[in-house]
Amino acid sequence: IDGFIKQISTHSKMHIDRKEDSPVDSSKDYIAIIGMSGRFADARNIEEFYYNLRNGKDSVREIPKERWDWSECFSTKENLKPGETYSRWGGYMDDIDKFDPLFFNISNQEAKGLDPQERIFLETAVETLEDSGYTPKSLDKEKLGVFVGVMWGQYQLYGADDAETGSSYASVANRVSYFLNAHGPSLAVDTMCSSSLTSLHLACKSILNGESSIALAGGVNITVHPNKYLYLSKTGFASTDGKCRSFGIDGDGYVPGDGS
């Protein structure tokens, strides 16, 4: 989920009982989330995601054919061989190949080489901007920082011999900064499952220490290559039945899920 974060000074709006010589603890300054956007499996936006949560909808399914044919490398955990996986489930977003490059001043040729994670985070970043009530022009006087948690950049494996195919984690954040003409920090972080939370933490710190006056923080994770499942099966991280049972006695692994 992408969120715009803005520091709000409240000292002039409320009375605080303290001694005259008491120092002001800037770490207690309030930071507000003023815009939000998100895409997930079976949810094109935050509203649909909330609806699914309220209704207990299970959005995990077998790997769709549009990604790859899981049956070509599927086995059981007991009989697993190199190049095989015992997991065939995940939470998958639809239409990850749909992208309007000209809106972002990107040529069609360049867009083909962009990792879907980069494309979709760019789209959700702009949606967050709209939700917050800002326009790119209104950010000119702000020090906008962009912080994104991202991992599993495997799109380039489909064109490893093509120099025009591929992406770096940094470009996921940098492209947003470039499009919005942002002048604050622009960085990508990979701390595995905590990547998005880490980016939010860094965004808050950047605001509090004055590096940014406003920040966009979030994460993106989209599974596009079977190599991820091969690794998760080899290391035993993947669930054997497509169910996550966090801290449960029957839990035996996790299920990958798309999101931005």
PLM regions and their residue ranges:
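4′-phosphopantetheine-dependent carrier domains
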Residues: 1-30, 34-40, 44-48, 97, ...
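ACP-dependent fatty acid/polyketide chain-elongation machinery
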Residues: 7, 11-110, 118, 127-130, ...
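Structural beta-strand/beta-sheet cores of well-ordered domains, especially the beta-sheet scaffolds
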Residues: 29-32, 49, 56-59, 89, ...
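Short secondary-structure boundary/hinge segments and terminal tails
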Residues: 71, 147, 194-195, 224-225, ...
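Hydrophobic (often cysteine-bearing) scaffold residues that line and stabilize catalytic clefts
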Residues: 114-121, 196
